[in-house]
Structure formats: structure tokens, C-alpha cells
A protein has these predicted regions:
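Short amphipathic alpha-helix used as the core "switch/output" element in two-component signaling
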Residues: 53-57, 78-91
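Acidic catalytic/metal-coordinating carboxylates
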Residues: 40-43, 61-64, 76-82
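Active-site residues of response regulator receiver
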Residues: 69
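Conserved acidic carboxylate
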Residues: 13
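Residue-level signal for the "D+5" position in two-component response regulator receiver
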Residues: 37, 72-75
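The feature encodes the CheY-like receiver
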Residues: 73, 82, 103
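Hydrophobic/aromatic residues positioned on beta-strands within the core alpha/beta folds
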Residues: 96-99
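Short hydrophobic/Thr-rich beta-strand motif most characteristic of the beta2 strand and flanking loop
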Residues: 32-39, 46-48
Length: 104
């Protein structure tokens, strides 16, 4: 199964173990879309807005879904979400917010 004609999913997760767990969950659910992993908030926005290392994707379609961690380096998940919602081109992309926390 794929979402929206095999469009890309953007996973924004800095913890490699959590990213691996999320990718495995997609795989076990037979979601076969290509998945791009961004390791921090700035990398996620660079991917979405075709900046920096991702400037070569300016003409490529946006992801069909964003899975976003809240606790990220460089720019937290809420900052990423605000930037996504502030732009006409990205404001309607569905965003699923996930986070894990170890409280003692």
C-alpha cells in the first residue's frame, strides 16, 4: 500500500533508534512510500523549501505526509510546524507529531 501515488513521506527525527522504529512501523504496515529522514528542524525545513543541501529538489513535489518529533536540535518541532503552516505552499501538508520522553 502507498499513500497518494507513492509520494514521499518526511520523517523528522533526531534519535536514530526512534527513526528506525518509525521506519519499521511503516514497513510492517505495508506503507511503501519513499521516506526521507531529516535529523533536525533546520534540515527538515531545508528539505521542504529546497534550501542548502536540498536546493537541487526545487522542482520536486512536496511530501504527502510529515511525521515530526517535537524535541529536535537546531529548531524544535513546534518551530518547524510554525514555519510549515506559515507558507502557502506547505500549510496544507498533514503533519503527525510524535515524541518520546523519559521522565524520571
Amino acid at each position: 500500500m502507498t499513500l497518494a501515488d507513492n509520494k514521499t513521506i518526511l520523517l523528522v527525527e533526531d534519535n536514530p533508534d526512534d527513526a528506525k522504529l518509525t521506519l519499521r512501523a511503516f514497513q510492517r504496515s505495508n506503507i511503501l512510500n519513499p521516506i526521507v529522514v531529516a535529523r533536525d528542524g533546520i534540515e527538515a525545513l531545508d528539505f521542504l523549501f529546497a534550501r542548502g543541501a536540498h536546493s537541487d529538489r526545487a522542482d520536486m513535489p512536496l511530501p504527502t505526509l510529515i511525521v515530526l518529533d517535537l524535541k529536535l536540535p537546531k529548531l524544535d518541532g513546534m518551530g518547524v510546524l510554525r514555519a510549515i503552516r506559515a507558507e502557502e505552499r506547505t500549510k496544507l501538508i498533514p503533519v503527525v507529531i510524535l515524541t518520546s520522553s523519559k521522565e524520571e
